[in-house]
């Protein structure tokens, strides 16, 4: 999947807007708001990615570099991939309303069976 520099800049601007409006980098921001922001970042990225690690690498590497230059850390390629994985596992934002931590959502996202994932969520 090829993406031009203008599209990358638009993605970058959209992500910056989300990070700043949700206070993602602020230590005082509640965890639920940070989780919502990560999900929203992934919702912006998902249409431009295929889910294929190799094909998505150039886009994620470019965005990661720009975001880390602006914010310091927290936007490495693995972090962006994690955001996408959680987004794909929980395509409806309402599915994130159970009060779990980001680490819980990451672990749940790795479960390929949707029904089992829901069962694990209820147990958590």
Regions found by a protein language model. Name each.
Residues 1-124:
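Basic, low-complexity intrinsically disordered segments
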């Amino acid at each position: 999947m090829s993406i031009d520099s203008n599209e990358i800049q638009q993605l970058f601007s959209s992500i910056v807007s989300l990070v700043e409006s949700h206070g993602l980098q602020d230590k005082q921001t509640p965890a639920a708001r940070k989780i919502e922001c990560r999900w929203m970042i992934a919702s912006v990225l998902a249409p431009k990615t295929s889910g294929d690690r190799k094909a998505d690498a150039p886009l994620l590497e470019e965005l990661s570099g720009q975001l880390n230059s602006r914010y310091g850390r927290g936007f490495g390629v693995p972090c962006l991939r994690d955001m996408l994985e959680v987004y794909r596992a929980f395509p409806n934002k309402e599915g994130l309303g159970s009060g779990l931590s980001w680490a819980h959502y990451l672990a749940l996202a790795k479960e390929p069976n949707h029904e089992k994932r829901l069962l694990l969520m209820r147990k958590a």
